[in-house]
Amino acid sequence: RLAYTRNTLNRKQFASSGNFFECKVSYVRGKELTFPGSTSIIDDTISKNHKWLSIQLEALSFPFQKKQVVNWGLHFKSVLNSQSLFANYTASMLALPGLNVLPDLDTYFIPAYRSTQYVCAGTQLIVSPLKNIDLRLDAYGFFPIIQLILNPDGTFTYAKPLDGRSVLAAGHVIYHSPVGPVRATINYLPKYAQPFQFQ
């Protein structure tokens, strides 16, 4: 695995100034061993070797560096992955890179936001009415280039490019305490069973 990172952000989480750029190149090689369960459409144990190349790019920039009440940032993330399919849909989805431009996306398993190859871009609007208090609105467009879909008969296939495109957003009230951020968040994830989530 190779990685290059340049980071001048003012905070590890919920930054409001600075720039971030990261490029990761990974080569993955492994062996899949699948034992069919009681609901599997596959009868036999499957053993299969896998190898793939993954390239991940991420950039976050706050163009106006001066301290001010209102600030905004531009955020971009992309994954290009040559991963082969696993024996079943769930195993394939678990191995795929998930979208995590919003903090709470790491706590959910949402197949619609997992893709072999995708581009995601958005903006972060930040209002700081008081010291250590931020009101934030993060809004993104998600464009999956290659995405798996589950068929009614239990098989799976690739969707048409950009077929699963979506918008997603989150609003936050954040207090930057000495030990880390304390926040109240409402997420809008239209591809999730309950699109509005409060954290």
Can you say where each PLM-predicted feature lies in the sequence?
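C-terminal/domain-terminus segments
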Residues: 134-152, 189-199
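Conserved active-site loop/cleft motifs that coordinate metal ions or position small ligands
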Residues: 134-138, 172-174, 181-188
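Outer-membrane beta-barrel domain signature
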Residues: 44-48, 108-112, 157-162, 185-189
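Intrinsic-disorder/low-complexity loop/linker signature
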Residues: 66, 153-155, 179
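C-terminal outer-membrane beta-barrel translocator/porin domains of Gram-negative envelope proteins
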Residues: 2-130, 135-137, 142, 147
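Short glycine-rich, acidic/polar surface loops and turns
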Residues: 122-123, 158-161, 166-173
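Outer-membrane beta-barrel "beta-signal"
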Residues: 173-182, 193-199
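Surface-exposed coil/turn segments at beta-strand junctions on protein surfaces, enriched
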Residues: 114, 128-130, 164, 175, ...
